[in-house]
Amino acid sequence: MSGAAAGGRGGGSWGPGRGGAGGLRRGCSPPAPAGSPRVGLQPLRATVPFQLQQPHQRRDGGGRAASVPCSVAPEKSVCRPQPPQVRRTFSLDTILSSYLLGQWPRDADGAFTCCTNDKATQTPLSWQEPEGERASFCMHKRSASWGSTDHRKEITKLKQQLQRTKLSRSGKEKERSCPVQGDHAALGAGRASLPSHPPGPPVLRLSPCLHRSLEGLNQELEEVFVKEQGEEELLRILEVPDGHRAPAPPQNSSCDHSLLLEPGNLTSSPSVPLASPQPPSQASREEHQGATEELASIHGNKASSPGNPAFLEDGSPSPVLAFAASPRPNHSYVFKREPPEGCERVRVFEEATSPGPDLAFLTSCPDKNKVHFNPTGSAFCPVSLIKPLFPSMGFIFRNCPSSPGSPLPTASPRAPRKGPEASKASSLPSEPWQRSPPSEESVLFQSSLVV
């Protein structure tokens, strides 16, 4: 292939600038001259036909014969490749930074810089095409690197202009909406011709049907949902529903005592309330006097008692200094929790308060006016009951079977005594409970409850 290419460049008897109709066959025999008549079918060629686009002959190889391919081989050493027109970047960082930012690296003067020549990476000059024949084919090239130097310079200038217009237009796009809904290429060209000026106030609100950028869309949504609603609608949205609202702060006139005794309502200076429009020094003096009088009137008896050191901590006679100490259970603090945010204060009925000394101790026993108890004494002693409260004893014990171990004897009439000897003899073998047998009036009971 290289021999065929060299033969095409050298010219010779094949014609000006043509490398033959079908190239060369793979072999040493030279092809037939172009003017000789072809007889019959030609053998199958093993090379791909090609044609060079060079109308003129080279000056250095014009007088050499091109009939033999090896005769034009020394031409390669004669032709020196010109400096290539391949652009190289300065460093890898330049490529990466510009690629990530979406910008094309450009030179200071807008032209190509001088690059070093490397035979291993440069394209030979023999493969390049002259500018005259390439003018008609420049629109069909795949990229700008296949074109001429002027074409690539023009493309580079266009890219630089586009980058400059993008940079100057980036500040304007945040505040301006797109006036055209369809084609944006014409919009970009029109904006590139506009002179750059400092950003002014935002453009007036356009119709919502027009296209907007991301910032414009956010602004439009904000106007729809916030600004277009009236003041009453905004107040209704911002109003906290009933039950979710935190309790109102207590008034100073009615809740001075709670403000003084609750440590949650005290600031860093414990005698100064939260909402104090006066200076701290003057307010602390006035509050100190007021707290002293109020606490002296409320806790006068407690402070006078020797066993209760509520207001005399660390030997200080001032009652307000008890609030500044650590919250010890010394009866100088009211341990009350403020309700959490969003909850209302509920007044609880105080049941667990300790009774005063004038109140009697309440027992859990039943009322003595309704229930009457009769003490029975020992369980083994006979007790005489009130007769009208019970029926006759004979009727009660008539149905009860008598047993030898039964503690309740049967009510039977006794035999009359015969004499003192007989009574002594009869009383000896008898049990202790049989010595005085009960009559109908007295029966052995352990206890009785009379209602």
UniProtKB/Swiss-Prot annotation:
Modified residues (Phosphoserine): 29, 67, 193, 213, 318, 326, 412, 426
Residue ranges, annotated region (Disordered): 1-83, 164-183, 242-293, 403-451
In-chain residues carrying the UniProt-annotated modification Phosphothreonine: 353
Biased composition (Polar residues): 436-451
Keyword vocabulary terms for this entry: Coiled coil, Phosphoprotein
Biased composition regions of type Gly residues, renumbered to the chain: 1-25
Keyword Phosphoprotein applies: yes
Chain coiled-coil ranges: 149-175
Protein family (similarity comment): Belongs to the FAM117 family.
Protein name (record): Protein FAM117A
Organism: Mus musculus
